[in-house]
Design a protein with these regions (language model features):
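Transmembrane beta-strands of outer-membrane beta-barrel pores
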Residues: 16-22, 73-79, 117-123, 138, ...
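Residues that define the transmembrane beta-barrel architecture of outer-membrane proteins
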Residues: 49-55, 95-99, 126-130, 156-160, ...
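Residue-level signature of outer-membrane beta-barrel architecture
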Residues: 2, 61, 105, 119, ...
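Outer-membrane beta-barrel "beta-signal"
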Residues: 164-171, 195-201
């Protein structure tokens, strides 16, 4: 037993992701002159423009039988021009530092509470964001959650969302109400840009 590990131990995880485009050399300055060719050659070991990069460190700690938490730090670079199709005055790349706390509390044999806090710091796009969420699970079927996302950078907008989920056997029914921010939404491997919405879901 150590001071860091304690009675239940401490988990440490480090993940690195780095994605770049191809190192391309165009064969013709005018694309209209290209016939029967891809239009460029590629260096086998060269690297093109940075598309996406992140380094994240995660610490998981069990404090007692009824409480455990995870702390995560992410350093992220996002090519807004390539991945989001941003143009004009929007920044080409977004550099962000993200801090996440995720805590789980076992209140009884049938009731559990999960809380999540996030802080995103960036000088690009809309600036800093904070996020908070509380999720109450009542076994075996009911889950209630309330979340708040707030831009403390440029827009000063609030995005509050509440939801109720009921599960019975193989069936699951969910009802949500609130406001969602505009941006990239990925579902089932398909990503698309969605507008800001408010209503029932």
């Amino acid at each position: 037993r150590t001071a860091l590990g304690g009675r239940y131990g401490t988990g440490l995880r480090i993940n690195v992701s780095h994605v770049r485009g191809l190192d391309k050399k165009m064969l013709k300055e005018n694309p209209d002159e290209l016939i029967g060719t891809d239009g460029y050659t590629v260096s086998s070991f060269g690297m093109g423009d940075l598309y996406y990069s992140d380094i994240d460190v995660e610490i998981a700690k069990k404090v007692s039988p009824g409480f455990n938490f995870t702390l995560t730090y992410l350093n992220q670079i996002y090519n807004n021009k390539v991945l989001h199709g941003a143009a004009g005055e929007k920044p080409e790349k977004i550099y962000a530092n993200i801090f996440v706390y995720d805590g789980k509390y076992k209140l009884s044999n049938k009731v559990a509470l999960r809380t999540e806090l996030q802080y995103l710091h960036t000088k690009q796009d809309q600036g800093d964001w904070i996020y908070g969420m509380a999720e109450l699970s009542i076994l075996p079927s009911l889950m209630l959650s309330l979340s708040e996302q707030y831009n403390i950078g440029e827009t000063k907008k609030h995005y509050v969302m509440g939801s109720v989920t009921y599960t019975h056997g193989a069936h699951r029914v969910a009802f949500s109400a609130g406001k969602t921010r505009a941006g990239m939404n990925c579902s089932g491997g398909v990503c698309r840009v969605v507008p800001e919405t408010q209503g029932f879901y």
